[in-house]
Amino acid sequence: VLIIAVLFLTACQLTTAETYSRGRQKHRARRSTDKNSKWTRECTRSGGACNSHTQCCDDFCSTATSTCI
């Protein structure tokens, strides 16, 4: 009887822990989405002026012509 009680309590704890971690994961995903929205940037399309590759949508800036390729 003691073994059955221990198994039952262990199963209850595992179920509760799994449900709790799923809830936390959903909030984590929402928080990271909000964080990413703050870091979104506008980019320059191909042919536009640029000073570095990070300004271009395709991440390539020609240093010879200072344009996004």
UniProtKB/Swiss-Prot annotation:
It holds the Pfam family Conotoxin. Disulfide bonds join 43-57, 50-61, 56-68. It is found in: Secreted. The keyword Disulfide bond applies. One of its GO terms (cellular component) is extracellular region. One of its GO terms (molecular function) is toxin activity. Residues 1-17 form the signal peptide. Expressed by the venom duct. Belongs to the conotoxin O1 superfamily. This precursor corresponds to allele E1d or E1b. Has not been merged with other alleles since they may differ due to geographic variation (see strains in PubMed:19606224). This is Conotoxin Eb6.9. The lineage of its organism: Eukaryota, Metazoa, Spiralia, Lophotrochozoa, Mollusca.
